[in-house]
Design a protein with these regions (language model features):
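Gly/Ser/Thr-rich active-site cleft segment
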Residues: 71-189, 255, 288-292, 320, ...
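ATP-dependent carbohydrate kinase catalytic cores
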Residues: 132-239, 250, 266, 270, ...
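A polyampholytic, Gly/Pro-enriched intrinsically disordered region
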Residues: 64-80, 177-179, 204-207, 390-404
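N-terminal phosphate-binding loop and adjacent alpha-helix
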Residues: 1-19
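Glycine/Thr-rich phosphate-binding loops that ligate phosphate moieties of nucleotide
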Residues: 3-7, 23-65, 97, 118-121, ...
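Short helix-loop-beta connector
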Residues: 18-22, 99-101, 178-180, 201-203, ...
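Active-site nucleophile and cofactor-binding loops and adjacent substrate-binding regions
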Residues: 24-29, 48-51, 75-83, 103-108, ...
């Protein structure tokens, strides 16, 4: 990751005539993934990523230790395989020597922060996805980590997303070709940053992001937790904000899998052309996109994908459309639960790879029954930049500037006939 940061920053600097005007650095990264460090801040083992589902046994242990009330009231989320705490317990059970060496637990963007500044810190939006954070009080949950017997000393300082977490060290500045002392913002988890970068900062707005996985995010006014723990409640990068989130683990990756299994060689745009020419419903063919399990709303890591209703008349185009529809309807399952807990948005904001497709934009609008407007910028990086501007003192809250800075594309209105 650090090598990638160095290469990317130096490449970006090649296109700038005056690097001294860089006022701050923003951070964003994938949620949940465990970076375990020893007492010398050296990485102990390769990171265990967010979509790794090896921790089912540890999740059941956490459920026993915390109970459903503890999960709701201490950490505000279900014990799911992708979260960070189960990964620590997996290391305890399967890599005891590595586990005994842990001195600090970080997430991906926070490891990059450490390399940039020498500071070990995490923002609330990422901490919320560890299963060790009190989302209502915006602090580590001493009670939860005690019940899981995870040392609280491993947990880094919490810093606000929109404030300075540290400054660029001389060593990092030399590696990047920048000036030492540049402020580094607290930053945000990828979905929280994408919401900031899409101007989805307050209740009544919602965002659909489709990349490797897919998410639907809806800001809420308080730390309300789904009674059935079928959704996530996370801290927003907007100060004193929270959001509900539903997740499809295999979204763009399901389409990539389908392309690769049928010969590959086509770009996603080429693959989608045939699907777009096929009528909605894919001739009664249904695809279940559970290639890596289901996260919300069913929380079943053992769930598996399937084509249902396949007959000899179905073509590759039908099956491609079924894959895209399956991802969209799976995400809609979570959206229906969100609507039961917060006000319905008047429009959806689309971001990330899948939402660059006009075909997929229209499908989301049709299935959700809400107009969808894509943003032209890349949500997470743009959100990180807005948070950097706040850390530099240009603004106080992301919501002050995001609506003015975010450029929107053409709105896709629902076509009722497509949903029938």
């Amino acid at each position: 990751w650090w090598d990638g940061v160095v290469a990317a920053v130096r490449q970006a600097m090649n296109g700038l005539s005056d690097v001294v005007n860089i006022r701050a650095i923003g951070l964003s990264g994938q949620m949940h993934s465990l970076v375990a460090l020893d007492s010398h801040d050296e990485v102990i083992r390769p990171a265990i990523l967010w979509n790794d589902t090896r921790t089912s046994e540890q999740c059941r242990e956490i459920e026993r230790r915390l109970g459903s009330d503890g999960l709701r009231h201490l950490v505000g989320n279900p014990a799911l395989e992708g979260f960070t705490a189960p990964k620590l317990l997996w290391m305890r059970d399967h890599e005891p020597k590595n586990y005994s060496r842990i001195a600090t637990m970080l997430l991906p963007k926070d490891y990059v922060r450490l390399k940039l500044t020498g500071v070990k810190a995490m923002d609330p939006s990422d901490a919320a996805g560890t299963l060790m954070f009190d989302i209502a009080e915006t602090r580590w949950s001493s009670a939860a980590v005690a019940k899981m017997e995870i040392p609280e000393t491993w947990l880094p300082e919490i810093v606000p997303s929109n404030k300075v977490s540290g400054t660029l060290s001389g060593e990092a500045a030399a590696a990047l070709g920048l000036s030492a002392g540049i402020p580094v913002a607290g930053g945000a988890a990828d979905n929280a940053a994408a919401a900031i970068g899409s101007a989805v900062t307050s209740p009544g707005t919602a965002m659909v992001s489709i990349g490797t996985g897919a998410t639907v995010v809806a800001p809420i006014p308080n730390a309300a937790v789904d009674p059935g723990l079928r959704l996530h409640t996370f801290n927003h990068a907007e100060p004193d904000g929270w959001y509900l989130m539903g997740v499809v683990l295999a979204a763009g990756s399901a389409l990539a899998w389908w392309r690769d299994q049928t010969g590959g060689g086509q770009s996603f745009d080429e693959l989608v052309v045939g699907a777009a020419e096929t009528a909605p419903g894919a001739d009664d063919l249904t695809f279940l996109p559970y290639l890596t399990g289901n996260r919300t709303p069913h929380a079943n890591a053992s769930a598996r994908g399937a084509f249902v209703g396949l007959h000899a008349g179905h073509t590759r185009a039908h099956m491609t459309r079924a894959v895209i529809e399956g991802v969209t309807f799976s995400l809609h399952d979570s959206y229906q639960l969100i609507l039961a807990q917060t006000e319905a948005p008047t429009e959806l904001i689309g971001t990330s790879g899948g939402m660059r497709s006009a075909f997929w934009q229209q499908m989301v609008a049709d299935v959700f029954g809400v107009p969808l407007t894509p943003v032209k910028s890349s949500g997470s990086p743009y959100g990180a930049a807005i948070l950097a501007a706040c850390a530099a003192g240009k603004f106080d809250r992301p919501s002050e500037v995001a609506p003015q800075w975010v450029t929107r594309g053409k709105t896709a209105d629902p076509i009722p006939a497509h949903a029938d």
